[in-house]
Each structure stands twice: as structure tokens, then as C-alpha cells.
Amino acid sequence: MEGLREARFPFSKLDENLICPIKTFAPEVREGSTVPTPVLFLQANFIRGGLLLTINAVHRTMDITGQVHMLSLLSKACRNVPFTDEEVTNGNLDRRNIIPLLDENWEADAQPPVIPKTTSTDTPSKQSAPPPQIGYAWAYFSFTSTSVAQLKAHATSSVTSPSAFVSSDDSLCALIWQSIARARLARLDPATASIFTRIVEIRQLFDIPKEFPGNIVTQTLNNSTLQDVTSQTIGDLASQLRSKLDPESLKHTFQANATRQARTKNKIIKPAAVDHSNFVMMSSWMKADCYDFDFNLGLGKPEAVRRPKFTPFPGAVFLSPRALDGEVVAGMCLREDEMEILKADEELLKYGQYIG
């Protein structure tokens, strides 16, 4: 535990193959299977001087909000604290009717938004060289509460539209997207598309109680070029991300997708083909309150909440739950050459510190 603490709990020391009860990309459950399938796994890893408690949830059954609420219930149960009537009722709502579908007059003429398939272009100087063996790296970057506040202030002051609001989450997402885009400019043409998707939790848009554990998220799609992403101010890029969070648009798109799926006989959704060389998928857990759970173990509150390293997923970025002192840790998976550039990115290092 002391070694982990001194290293600040990096990806390199937190491998899911060693500390998790199931892998992130576990085999799919076969359609029509009648065998009950667990949806929440826990594993206690006893190490010298401490404990690593890992919790895996099946994403089809719950999002991060649902998973955190399930953990809050587990922590209450461990302390023999009874659940409230509201927790029991809202936790058992009928998922089949939780999202109101659009009426029969709605025409499914528009296709659901998809991540565009793009082809990246290496710079001419790199085209003649044989393609190197690509390696991928997971790494964490730490942002203190002070640096996050400074970043938000900088973003707010650099928005060209005077009435635009940007949050800390918007600002941090913009900084990370722009930093990754700069790293990719070392090998890609500036006109190459840069795709940024952002997972958004939308319970409040449908008056769904926060105690409902189901998967109620959608994603926004931002499509620019590397040149555009790197040339904008942090404030304008954050404002661009914020503009995709229009409540009515998010609500209608989600209902349209749900209605389209309800009218489709084949319910299996195949994942879209993605060019990971210019793709960033952001999932923010900053608001997930994970640092108050003690599970009555007598060990106090957790020192760190992290996402263990798993199979490389280039372009994936996770903002970990905000710590008690306000620290936010961003975990990301990139090509090794991109990560080396990112580790020396002066703009990123104004606010963040590399952990690994």
C-alpha cells in the first residue's frame, strides 16, 4: 500500500487481470440463455498494509450513476442502515416504461447520429517509412482543485461569446481534447478530422429519480479538424462542447433512438466502426460521490478511486470521481508516441501532473 501511495496509484500498478473479478471486455451473454447472469461483481484484494476493493458492473444494466448508487446501498447495508422507502421504490421502477416513446405519428426518417468513419492521413515525411509496430499506453494525469478552478477561470475569460457559460467539466474536457489533438499533429495532417464524443447522463430530462440504477446515458458528437481544435481558445472549445448539451435536443434524440429501437425486431446493436487514430471518447465521473463509502470495514474512507488498466482502448478518457480535497484524475489510453508528446505538453502541464 505504501508503494501504491508513493506512486499515486498509477495504471501501471492497477491491472484488471490481477485485481478484478471479471474483465472489462468480458464475453457477451448468448441470446436466449436461461442461466442467471450476475450484473455486479466485487473482489477484495488484500495487500500488505491495505485493501484494493474492485467493483465491476455490467454496463448494459447500469451507468456510473446507477453503479455509484448501488455502492451507496451496499455501504448502508454493511452498516446495518435500512434503505428508505424511496430508495426501494425508485430502485425497482419498471425499466420497460422508464423512457416515454414518441407517438405513432413520428417518422423515423432521420438516421441516428453515428461516429463518422474517417481515414487519417500521415504527414508526407512519414508516408515513405515502413509502418512501425504501434504500442498503446494507459496513463493518469492529476488536476488539483486549485488548477481546475484556474482552468475554468481561464476558459471563461477566453470565450469570445460574452454570455456563454462553461463548467469545470467543459473546461477540462476541452483542455484534454486540445492536448491530444496537438500530440496527433506530429503524425497527422492538420485537416484530419478529430472526433470527440462525450457521455451524458440524462435522468433529470425525464424526471427519473437518481435512485434508479439503469443505464440512462446518451452521447454527444463533436466533429472538427485537428487544425480547428488546436487553434481555438480553451474557452471557445469548451463552449462548443457545452452547446451540444441542449436539454431539448438531448431528450428528443434519446427518445427517437429508443422509439426506433422499440420498432426494430432485431434488438442487437452492433458497435460502429471507429478510426481510433483520431477519436476521443470522454466519460466524466467527476460528480460521482465515491469517497464517502467505508462499507463498515474499519479502514476509513478510500484513499483513491481509480479505473484499473484494461485492454487498450485508444482514445478512451475517464475523469475519475472528485477526491475529498477536490483533486480530479484523468485516465486515458493513447498510442505510446502520442503519450510521450502529451507528457511534455506545456499547456496541459500548466494545470495537470503526469502520474502514469
Label each PLM-derived region with a short phrase:
Residues 25, 57, 126, 130-134, ...:
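A near-ubiquitous, low-amplitude feature marking generic local secondary-structure context
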Residues 1, 87-156, 185, 194-206:
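Short amphipathic alpha-helices and their capping loops
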